[in-house]
């Protein structure tokens, strides 16, 4: 680890929390250079929903490269691009009666958010965007402006304008955040201009695994319709099956105006992002938003295979929901077994967590878990949540093995 300390920027973070050199990974397991095996409850921060090195994705990528096919192409026409567009439309959009234009904004989550904010402002002619407490939407200036975390916002180095933060669902106990939002929009003295868009995560991944209720999401959608505000759903982490359905908003029965996808849309962990835009709002001029690496053909190959292998029917979705029930059972068991932690369960699907109010306790648990073979991180504004984000392909044995390690880690921390 000395090389990283000496040569790499101080901005690095994950290598500090997991101080080893990883060498190999398959499915939901990783190995370091010393042969130590780790259960993965992190999944590349949600970029590895289909696990590490999925066999057929791996095979198709190797074959494509060996045949000297196009790797880099910006937004030029290529066979992988064409095949992905057709597959995504026929496998994901059409069965859900969703009609979107598919935009490739650049390869990261913040790219898709930036493009969503830009097109919303262009279409409406307004500049303000409403976001929510504890939101996280990315690390570039536009995305940071709608992010709640003060540490990350401060890193911008400049004032962040044209956004207003509103309370997320259940942010304040016994307070109706919907009524609060409606009052701000209705009252000409609120100081809040009619916004171009409202942007939200249905489950706040970095903000503490806060899951919005179905009713709250439906009311937000109704507000947007009433006031002619565009609804942007940031599904970068909660999408691609993470909460049980391909899109996290499906259970609410809503159809956002714009949807942001990245992370696991690339299938095997390759950089890729897409922005889904209702056709009437696809008012870009050619090249008005672009990027050198928005045509990642290797990601198109893996993404298409992921859609074909996992999303032709609802079998995979059902398996995620079943596994999520086991995760919740293990969380409830921990809460009962360790009452001194004052734990609280949060999240849905395979995007869950335990809130531990004692300062630094969640971080200590994650550190202890790493030492005995579990990769798991914290979430929340004060790192107060132990966050569970395993690959969606994990089996029951892997879930139980990971939680067994977690319980041992908690016992170790509580004995200190």
From Swiss-Prot:
Swiss-Prot/TrEMBL GO biological process terms: ectoine biosynthetic process
Biochemical pathway: Amine and polyamine biosynthesis; ectoine biosynthesis; L-ectoine from L-aspartate 4-semialdehyde: step 1/3
Record key words, sorted: Aminotransferase, Pyridoxal phosphate, Transferase
SUPFAM superfamilies: PLP-dependent transferases
Name of the coding gene: ectB
Listed cofactors: pyridoxal 5'-phosphate
PANTHER family: DIAMINOBUTYRATE--2-OXOGLUTARATE AMINOTRANSFERASE, DIAMINOBUTYRATE--2-OXOGLUTARATE TRANSAMINASE
EC number: 2.6.1.76
Family recorded in the similarity comment: Belongs to the class-III pyridoxal-phosphate-dependent aminotransferase family.
GO molecular function: diaminobutyrate-2-oxoglutarate transaminase activity; diaminobutyrate-pyruvate transaminase activity; pyridoxal phosphate binding
PROSITE patterns xrefs: AA_TRANSFER_CLASS_3
Protein name as catalogued: Diaminobutyrate--2-oxoglutarate transaminase
Residues recorded as bearing N6-(pyridoxal phosphate)lysine in the entry: 263
Record has Isomerase as a keyword: no
Taxonomy, superkingdom: Bacteria
């Amino acid at each position: 680890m000395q090389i990283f300390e000496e040569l790499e920027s101080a901005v690095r973070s994950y290598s500090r929390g997991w101080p080893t050199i990883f060498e190999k990974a398959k499915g939901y397991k990783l190995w370091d250079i010393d042969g130590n095996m780790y259960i993965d409850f992190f999944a590349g921060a949600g970029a590895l929903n289909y696990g590490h090195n999925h066999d057929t994705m791996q095979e198709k990528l190797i074959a494509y490269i060996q045949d000297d096919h196009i790797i880099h192409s910006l937004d030029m026409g290529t066979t992988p691009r064409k095949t992905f567009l057709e597959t995504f439309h026929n496998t994901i959009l059409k069965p859900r009666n969703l009609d979107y234009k598919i935009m490739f904004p650049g390869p990261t989550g913040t790219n898709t958010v930036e493009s969503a904010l830009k097109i919303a402002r262009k279409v409406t002619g307004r500049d303000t965007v409403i976001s929510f407490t504890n939101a996280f939407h990315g690390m570039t200036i536009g995305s940071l402006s709608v992010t709640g975390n003060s540490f990350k916002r401060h890193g911008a180095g400049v004032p962040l304008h044209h956004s207003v933060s509103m309370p997320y669902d259940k942010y304040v106990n016994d307070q109706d955040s919907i009524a609060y939002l409606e009052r701000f929009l209705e009252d000409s003295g609120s100081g809040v201009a009619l916004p171009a868009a409202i942007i939200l995560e249905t489950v706040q991944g970095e903000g503490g695994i806060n899951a919005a209720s179905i009713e709250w999401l439906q009311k937000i959608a109704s507000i947007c319709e009433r006031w002619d505000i565009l609804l942007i759903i940031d599904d970068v982490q909660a999408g691609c099956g993470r909460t049980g359905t391909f899109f996290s908003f499906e259970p609410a029965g809503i159809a956002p105006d714009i949807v942001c996808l990245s992370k696991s849309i690339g299938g095997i962990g390759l950089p890729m992002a897409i922005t889904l835009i209702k056709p009437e709002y696809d008012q870009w001029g050619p090249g008005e938003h672009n990027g050198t690496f928005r045509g990642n053909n290797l990601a198109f190959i893996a993404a298409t295979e992921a859609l074909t292998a996992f999303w032709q029917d609802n079998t995979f979705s059902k398996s995620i929901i079943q596994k999520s029930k086991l995760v919740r059972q293990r969380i409830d068991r921990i809460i009962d077994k360790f009452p001194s932690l004052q734990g609280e369960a949060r999240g849905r699907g395979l995007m869950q967590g335990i809130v531990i109010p004692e300062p630094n306790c969640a971080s200590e648990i994650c550190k202890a878990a790493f030492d005995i073979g579990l990769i798991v991180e914290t979430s929340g504004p004060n790192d107060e949540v132990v966050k569970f984000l395993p690959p969606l392909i994990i089996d029951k044995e892997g879930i139980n093995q990971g939680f067994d390690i977690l319980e041992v880690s908690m016992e170790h921390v509580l004995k200190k």
